[in-house]
């Protein structure tokens, strides 16, 4: 049967060619003579594809069947039609020929890299990738690396199908896919901003992959989380691009199952030695994020963060050059550092006492030398510095008093060691802060009631933050001027706190720092609630009156119904009987002035 079919097809082809030659000799141009054989040739390649498919589908396994699959790979680059159809046949029989899989993947890669303008051809090749990896996950790592480079394309359709293929690969094997993404980022040595392919990949990871990772790995095994955390930390140590750093820290936040001491060990081993030689801005950004990571696992007040290398970077790299930072970066740095001071050990915290106080003096001038109106203070920075100063001073009050010139009256000879010059200098800065904060506090209180419009939400938030920071500054300064200084800040929440729960407490719940209009609204709500409760009680009482009357009538009927009849003479005889020991008590009601029916429980002996 096969021989007959082949002969018939050849004859038909020959007849067609003869007819074409006859027509070309009479009317056809040379252009027509070159087009027609190409159409026939395309039909031959397509028919060959389907003939091979029929043979492979008919027999699951037979000798030399790999030659047929090799023929499919060979024909894939012949014409445009075969380029469009070959991914379909390659993906269908890919699993059946493991020895030819590498060759088939190279064929698909050639279709990706083809300079042909036909987008459909490349889209078909992209669609075949998840299919061939569904039963062969060993090729995922290689294909993820290749597809990551193809994201930077001018065709939106092609870029969208590339993203879909990467997402499908992630769903097939998330561990291998995510590890391949990290390997791709690790291979990039230069800045991500200078390489469009890497920038496109970072954007794709942020929009599509990180939400999937956050959902899947929130409750994964500790071993898996540790593996990825170590990999990401090593990438962070080498990275200098702001865009890549933001992405890596977002990815690091997806793996939340870790302990403080384990993280400190990883930082001191793999990260901190590498970043010492980097720029000030890079060190600042990394230190802030590392400090936040440690703080989120150290929410308890007495949890210590014992990392000498981490705080050495603050002491030697950051504080000497902190004034070189712009206002926004300086505010963020000082705020985060102040929140970690309660978790420092006493040995580490004493190293920061003088640098923090010197930075405070450089930020806040003295009233004796500078008019209040001439200085525009950054209250968030001042609040954070005072918070850090109180926190560090609580670990050694004597060191704080010696630094600021406070005089402690203890009856000991050391009372005479106070430095009056230092104390007067501190008092001058206190007077400056007191006047400046009270002036700003009054402005904030007046502004908040007028910011009820939803459009003024940002201004309202800023006014609330200013109100809180000025109140905190006044509270801390007043406590420091007491004898002895009060340095307890456990119940104090600074305006720049990194904990979202405490931020909500500041703006919505906290009665200490709530604006006046919120207090007034709260009082009105309480009054309305009491009135409503009183109204409900009255309604309930009115509903119970008929029920009580009915119960009284029923009780009276029962008492009359079962009480035996006693003649009047018998009743007087009972009253005239000699009384036994005890006292007879008569109860009279206030309304009717009649004896009550209550007779007590037996004779009473008084």
Curated annotation (Swiss-Prot):
Residues 1-30, 537-606 are annotated as: Disordered. The gene is api5. The lineage of its organism: Eukaryota, Amoebozoa, Evosea, Eumycetozoa, Dictyostelia. May be an antiapoptotic factor. One of its GO terms (biological process) is negative regulation of apoptotic process. This is Apoptosis inhibitor 5 homolog. One of its GO terms (cellular component) is nucleus. Belongs to the API5 family. Residues 571-593 have a biased composition (Basic and acidic residues). Keywords: Apoptosis.
